[in-house]
Amino acid sequence: MRIQLLLVSTLVASIVATRVEDMATFRTEKQWQQDLQYRREFVKRQLAPKPKSNIVVSHTVSCVIDGGNMTSVWRFEGQFNPHIASEVILHDTSGLYNVPHEVQNDGQVLTVTVKRSAPADIAKVLISLKPVQLSSGQYECRPQLQLPWVPRPSSFMYDSYRLWYEKRWLTIILYVFMWTYLVTLLQYCIVRFIGTRLFYFLQRNITIRFTGKPTYNLLTYPVKG
């Protein structure tokens, strides 16, 4: 019964791990470096000189999820100098992940579009225009998906990210189930086939030594004392 239960648990863990790992978006080392580059560019933009002649009159925001990617468009009307493109910042709620985007500016209409390569699992994207002080400070686009944890530049945290957010822990659980099953099966074989024979062998010798009476080994042949 115990072996059957372990076998069923192993099968269920294998199916769940396979399904979840197939659905997970694995972040490669190249993508990891891109995240760090986005962070560096974000800091550079924060430290860059900011022009003072931008005015926002009105704005509209649209945000959709299309084909597994998030697309959003901010459209601002007003007066914008040519350098405003370098002052547009799109980021998630933590402020650590800079969302890839494109900016178009004709002086009176400023259009900011999230690239189609942006993942759809960002729950909230904020836009900042500096030095323009918008009425609410920031405008947001909020798709209905879970925000991913974006790793900081640390090898330990990167490994933790791959383990948890790419569902590698399910693989580890599967391995634990498999090894537990194999060890339990080995223990069962030892007790069932080797331990039983050894028990009868010792019982026969002890009986002969202390009683002098003949006994029978049920596994092999009758023994005469």
Curated annotation (Swiss-Prot):
Residues 18-170 are lumenal. One of its GO terms (cellular component) is host cell endoplasmic reticulum membrane. Its main location: host cell. Keywords: Disulfide bond, Glycoprotein, Host endoplasmic reticulum, Host membrane, Immunoglobulin domain, Membrane, Signal, Transmembrane, Transmembrane helix. Glycans are attached at N69. Residues 54-145 form the Ig-like H-type domain. Residues 192-225 are cytoplasmic. One of its GO terms (biological process) is symbiont-mediated perturbation of host defense response. This is Membrane glycoprotein US7.
